[in-house]
Amino acid sequence: RLGMLILSGDITDKLSWMVQYELFTSQLLKLYACYKPYSFFQVKIGRMKTCFTLENQMSPSVYETVNFSRVIERLAGFSGDVCGNQGGRDMGLQVGGELFKTSVDDYFLEYRVGVYNGSGLSMKDHNDAKDFAAWFTVQPVKGLKMGASAYIGKLNDDYTVVNDETGEETIYN
């Protein structure tokens, strides 16, 4: 079962917010503010999807399958990950943007870089270390995107559980 309450809005033309609440599990999934002064630069702060893999950052409503691929479930903080099922989300600060517009909705380069607590949906940080993620894609021809991402972090109090991941992706539509 899945039921979501999603609220979002614009405070100004450059400042927006979003809240996403899962009704059946009573879990707050997203709560962030986003400042976007330019298309090439935005800053997000709060609870959000981490910028690891293209699929993790997409809305489930655009998938051609029922759920995430097994690879993303393992790598991006879903079931089977060392962090447990965190929905690919965490608390943190993320910067990113799009560069070199090629058409109405397309850009040659997209990027995101984030610093996160590393504790997933939990509000409590498990250690003093922060996790880092980076993602970028290039679109050399219309419809073809190629990219790479990396996630570097430590999970538990004594820093013995390493959560370092890398990925590459190609999508054509």
Question: Can you say where each PLM-predicted feature lies in the sequence?
Answer:
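Outer membrane beta-barrel
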Residues: 1-121, 126-133, 137-152
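Detector for outer-membrane/organellar transmembrane beta-barrel domains
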Residues: 137-173
